[in-house]
Amino acid sequence: MSTPLTLDNARRPDGTRVLSVVGEIDMSNSGELAAAVEAELAQTGGSVLLDLTRVEYLDSAGLYVLLLHAERIEILATPLIAPVLVLSGLPELTAVHGLE
């Protein structure tokens, strides 16, 4: 059974593509996240901002998706998932905002 995950995309006035993620990211839905990130990246020649401020849980399958695309994404996080992102080394590979 897949864990519920909501993905919404938008474009900011400055042209930045934003993919907002709501729910829990785990093995059951990480493929859905990967497909959404890849679709957003295909729409832009630049990077995509992943808004993870409403993510309540992130496991290693979700981290894998983030690490796989680290060169072309930026992440907006919250203190809830910040420790996982820091331990994975992700802030050394891409911009991660909201680690405070």
Model-derived segments and spans:
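Short, charged, intrinsically disordered terminal tails
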Residues: 2-6, 86-100
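Amphipathic alpha-helical interaction surfaces in cytosolic regulatory modules
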Residues: 27-94
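Intrinsically disordered, low-complexity regions
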Residues: 16, 24, 46-47, 99
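STAS-typified acidic loop motif
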Residues: 1-35
